[in-house]
Design a protein with these regions (language model features):
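The feature marks proteins involved in alpha-glucan
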Residues: 1-50, 84-166, 171-180, 184-187
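Substrate-binding/active-site clefts of carbohydrate-active enzymes
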Residues: 150-159, 168-314
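Structural beta-strand segments of beta-rich domains
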Residues: 51-56
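Short, surface-exposed loop motifs enriched in S/T, G, D/E and P with embedded aromatic residues
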Residues: 76-85
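Short beta-strand elements bearing conserved aromatic residues within extracellular beta-rich modules
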Residues: 65-67, 103
Length: 314
């Protein structure tokens, strides 16, 4: 898939536009915000007739946070965000930044002057790996599975027969004549639906499709907890996949991995120059077998992040 970048003139950051309310800040810091994907990350908005994108990221130990991307030549200084009180959240509205724009957060930490560039933890879309930038996107889609949902809602799921077909989308079927590439979400939908129905399965369980840098992990080392992997298409392509299976009376189960995450430089590890998402005690924050990081479940904001991710996919 070809990703486009904005050609609009981009203005300086404005701080008068925010998607976060006082209640949002309170719930987030308390550990009870379950819909962060509606407030944080990158969201296309229009304010006073001006179209642009609101950026929001949690980095409580940062001295400065700026957005760099394809819209400003990846400049690390021109578009700084502003901290919102004591919430640890940095936010700003950048006029002219549109759908398809690539971006990252440049974080200058209070911790020993540490500087890093990070992908957006709440991004809805990313570049196709091995590239690691986040992509400004929306979730506009017209669903056609109302009949399936109505039927499912009326059924007694506790007593209904259930037969699950587990599948890794990237290896289930490939195209040998095109360098053995995997099928896209839209290509695999009719093939998988037909195969599953012929075999009599009621459900498909997908190995993790959330974005992940290491293909060999089969998705079990997640970096994008709100983004379907770009390896097979866009978020709308994934929605089409789920929609198609629903229309053919196949329920979809998603594997979700809140247990650990990889230490890749663009990801969650050492996010703002401190152990933010992972536990600071290596006995609790590092998985010796997988060489991955373990979430700090005792941190309220981490709980908000993980619960929001779980709710996002429902």
């Amino acid at each position: 898939m070809t990703q486009t970048t904005t050609t609009q003139e981009v203005s300086p950051v404005r701080y008068d536009v925010s998607l976060m309310t006082a209640e949002d800040f309170y719930l987030f810091n308390e550990g009870n915000h379950y819909r962060l994907y509606e407030k944080m990350g990158a969201h296309l908005v229009e304010s006073g007739g001006t179209k642009g994108t609101v950026f929001s990221v949690w980095a409580p130990n940062a001295r400065q946070v700026a957005v760099s991307g394809s819209f400003n030549g990846w400049n690390l200084q021109t578009h700084p965000l502003q901290p919102r009180g004591s919430s640890g959240i940095w936010e700003g509205f950048i006029p002219g930044v549109g759908k398809g724009t690539l971006y990252k957060f440049h974080i200058n930490s209070n911790q020993d002057g540490h500087e890093t560039e990070k992908a957006d933890p709440v991004a809805l879309f990313t570049e196709k790996p091995p590239r690691t930038a986040s992509v400004v996107w929306d979730l506009d889609y017209t669903w056609n599975d109302a009949a399936f949902l109505e039927k499912r809602g009326a059924a007694n799921s506790l007593h209904a027969p259930m037969s699950i077909y587990e599948v890794h989308l990237g290896s289930w079927m490939r195209v040998p004549e095109e360098h053995n590439r995997p099928l896209t979400y839209r290509e695999i939908a009719p093939r998988l639906a037909d195969h599953v129905n012929k075999l009599g399965f009621t459900h498909v369980e997908l190995l993790p499709i959330m974005e992940h840098p290491f293909y060999g992990s089969w998705g079990y080392q997640t970096t994008g907890y709100f983004a379907p992997t770009a390896r097979y298409g866009s978020p709308q392509d994934f929605m089409y996949f789920v929609d198609y299976l629903h229309q053919h009376n196949i329920a979809v189960i998603l594997d979700w991995v809140p247990s650990h995450f990889p230490s890749d430089g663009h990801g969650l590890a050492f996010f703002d120059g401190t152990h933010l998402f992972e536990h600071s005690d290596s006995r609790q924050g590092f998985h010796p077998d997988w060489k991955t990081m373990i979430f700090n479940y005792g941190r309220t904001e981490v709980r908000s992040f993980l619960m929001s991710s779980a709710m996002f996919w429902l």
